[in-house]
Design a protein with these regions (language model features):
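Short helix-coil boundary/hinge micro-motifs
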Residues: 1-270
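BZIP DNA-binding basic region
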Residues: 245-306
Length: 306
């Protein structure tokens, strides 16, 4: 996959500090800290590492790890790469500000097929509202008093308004939604791995259930254009980090040279050097063999005691 994205670029915004805050209704959100500083970066430079970290956050939940460990891992991820951009990922178009309402396909988080724009925005600005005016299909918003936010807005002036709005400090994403997305990605990976590992042990009905589960995984392909830099470069127009991760994860999932694997010992997701790679490190391999050997010896001791 590295070769695929070697001459590719994109951009996203991350802040250097995030926090989990509780809203008036008791719902928890992830949002940049008040004095956090934004940074524009190219997520494609860290594509494999980002996908692996996202999957391993999800695996913590799949393995029922303590909630404080999960929270720490989620905050670490968003500090590394930014929030997922759920506000622009969920609607039928990231340019939803150009329409009278927000239209939503089926998703895990919002049951309504359409929402008033103000009501939809309120889901992502529970603490501080933006200076926004919306009348029909016309909308405008202004940023003043914070030079950093003004500069950030001007940098993304040609992007969909909602995407630029999601880079502001006031933007927040529901913690449970973010956590669920990580868990969904981990579930997709384990479905794929179990399907092939257990293929000869399961019946055709069970195989079909696995296939149906995988068929539900997908997304709208991002648009792209070519930029003439030091050499021709593909520029991917990700309107949400979620969409970017989804695409990168998809390519890794079908990569036969360096397949995504689950460590047989620690259950960590890693890129295998070959198709039958079973351990993420020599240490895990050694520990697994030691525990396996102890288990055999314990069984033999029990037989001798009889």
């Amino acid at each position: 996959m590295n070769n695929l994205f070697a001459q590719s670029r994109s951009h996203w915004v991350r802040y250097d500090r995030y926090e989990i805050k509780t809203g008036k209704t008791g719902k928890r959100y992830i949002t940049p800290e008040k004095t956090a500083k934004p940074d524009i970066y190219n997520p494609l430079k860290e594509s494999s590492e980002m996908v692996l970290e996202a999957l391993n956050v999800g695996m913590l939940m799949m393995n029922r790890s303590p909630e404080d460990a999960v929270e720490k891992a989620i905050l670490t991820f968003v500090t590394h790469y930014g929030l997922l951009g759920l506000m622009t990922a969920l609607p039928t178009t990231p340019s939803f500000m150009d329409y009278e309402k927000v239209y939503l396909p089926k998703n895990h988080f919002i049951r309504a097929e359409s929402m008033e724009t103000e009501d939809y925005l309120a889901l992502f600005y529970p603490f501080d509202q933006l200076d926004l005016v919306k009348k029909g299909i016309e909308s405008s918003w202004s940023v003043s008093g914070d030079r950093t936010m003004v500069a950030l807005t001007m940098t993304f002036a040609d992007e969909p308004m909602a995407k630029t709005m999601s880079f502001q400090r006031e933007y927040a994403e529901p913690y449970e939604w973010v956590a669920q997305q990580f868990k969904d990605w981990a579930f997709t990976l384990t479905t794929s791995i179990l399907y092939y590992n257990d293929y000869n042990l399961i019946d055709e009905d069970t195989r079909n259930l696995y296939r149906m589960g995988m068929a539900a995984f997908g997304g709208i392909a991002p648009s792209y254009h070519i930029e003439l830099l030091d050499k021709p470069t593909i520029y991917w127009d990700f309107h949400s980090l979620l969409l970017g991760i989804q695409m990168m994860f998809s390519f890794l999932l079908v990569d036969g040279e360096k397949p995504l694997r689950l460590c047989k010992h620690c259950q960590k997701v890693f890129l295998g050097s070959r198709a039958n790679s079973a351990f993420c490190s020599p240490r895990c391999k050694n520990q697994y063999n030691v525990y396996k050997s102890r288990g055999k010896n314990k069984g033999q001791d029990g037989e001798n005691d009889d």
